[in-house]
Amino acid sequence: MENRPALKPEQQQVFEKLCIQLPEIMRSEFPDVPDHDHYTNAGAIGRFAAAHEYKTETVIAKWKAWVQWRSTYKPHEISETEETIEKQTESGKLRWYKYDKEKRPCLYYRMRFHTLGLATPDETVRFFIYMLEKGLKEAEKLGQTKIVVVYDRRGYDKSNQDPKSIDAGKQLTPLLQDYYPERLHCFYVIGANWFYRMMFNIVKTFVSKKTLEKIAILGSTEDLLDTFNKEDLLIEYGGVTEGDQKFAEKVKKSKRNGADEGDESEDETELRKLADNIYKNHGVEPPKLTDGM
């Protein structure tokens, strides 16, 4: 079971009051929403309280917004048989595989498998939410409440360039921060070159400070061994297994497989143009890049 930090006396007092208040609000304002316990269990209340620094009014407002969103959007009912879910799953961009040393499920997010035009921003958001729900169910089985993400940018080139990625990110980020608080343990980044750093300057304008503090840029895949056991990592990340056979065969056939893939230097001119356009569209002043950045 995941260890939670001890609460200060004043935090404990707020938490205990919320454990009384929120079930009452649930019964009075959301009587027709099923599975009240999902929204009013101590774990859920604790996550919202911690995410919003035990400020009672803020916690209640954010919690109510979550109940409203979840009971309307119904993320737990998204099916793997939906066309948009099937096609994005087949792309291989997102994939759950095992866990870190603390048994937190790991989501591999591999940009070299991003397919331009495969999904609209709304469909991309729906797929991410589907995958997150899937991972959190696994976390619960393992006695955990959080997940980790390995964001792998190696092999990303002009065929993956998608100006709408930022739009999808702007839609998705508030949903994750508001409706899945305290679910992310760490977001590991592999292959963080100059283009990533340029895009990060935009991303950080709509990502909370708390979330930004969970981003860890790794120098190489070997750094993952600090937090993962070797037997729980895929071969391309310094592990010893290819994972399930079906997925392994797909990866072997891909022209983008492996850590030896080149960087984005051959596409640098096009990527700089893309970056400038994205900055312009989002009203952010681009940094001055120097050769070798």
What are the language-model segments listed below?
Residues M1-M293:
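Basic, amphipathic alpha-helical/coil surface patches used to engage anionic, phosphate-bearing ligands
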